[in-house]
């Protein structure tokens, strides 16, 4: 029904965004990983590729940063026992390129590590994904990746993102500094922010 929605990104929450387009605010479920990255685009023009699920009482929108990721989502929800929430959880834990690698190497343990998927489900899903691998491989090869050093600009963006969530500059700087200690060189902002927020739950406040 909708290929994509383009408008102003007005709200970012854990696993969801709101895009205003022609006076209508579209609530769109996305991965938590991408939601963290979306914070930087608040109040800016934004495009998201969408998948709509129609139910008797509601229409649910799911969003993706690329058509390739959306196609992977559609492949996942075609499997018995995999609903949209679990499919998003899989893509959150195992982004498209990683998921393709997991399937190629038949890494059952990695797939079973996703919350909501046990070993038996992972084994069954792996068999089905292997059958779909010809569909996934072209997507994997088209996904652009970049390995960059953790630059000062990246750290500054992290501080700004935390500030947008209500953290003071001092708290944000401390959280980012602690997070990068646990990450390898070349980590991106998408890697840094989840660690920073996780550490916050262990005792860092917003002040």
Swiss-Prot record:
Region described as Domain III: 150-207
Chain positions covered by the region annotation Flexible linker: 145-150
Major place of residence: cytoplasm
GO molecular function: ATP binding; four-way junction DNA binding; four-way junction helicase activity
Function recorded in the entry: The RuvA-RuvB-RuvC complex processes Holliday junction (HJ) DNA during genetic recombination and DNA repair, while the RuvA-RuvB complex plays an important role in the rescue of blocked DNA replication forks via replication fork reversal (RFR). RuvA specifically binds to HJ cruciform DNA, conferring on it an open structure. The RuvB hexamer acts as an ATP-dependent pump, pulling dsDNA into and through the RuvAB complex. HJ branch migration allows RuvC to scan DNA until it finds its consensus sequence, where it cleaves and resolves the cruciform DNA.
Domain observations: Has three domains with a flexible linker between the domains II and III and assumes an 'L' shape. Domain III is highly mobile and contacts RuvB.
Assembly, per entry: Homotetramer. Forms an RuvA(8)-RuvB(12)-Holliday junction (HJ) complex. HJ DNA is sandwiched between 2 RuvA tetramers; dsDNA enters through RuvA and exits via RuvB. An RuvB hexamer assembles on each DNA strand where it exits the tetramer. Each RuvB hexamer is contacted by two RuvA subunits (via domain III) on 2 adjacent RuvB subunits; this complex drives branch migration. In the full resolvosome a probable DNA-RuvA(4)-RuvB(12)-RuvC(2) complex forms which resolves the HJ.
Protein name listed in UniProt: Holliday junction branch migration complex subunit RuvA
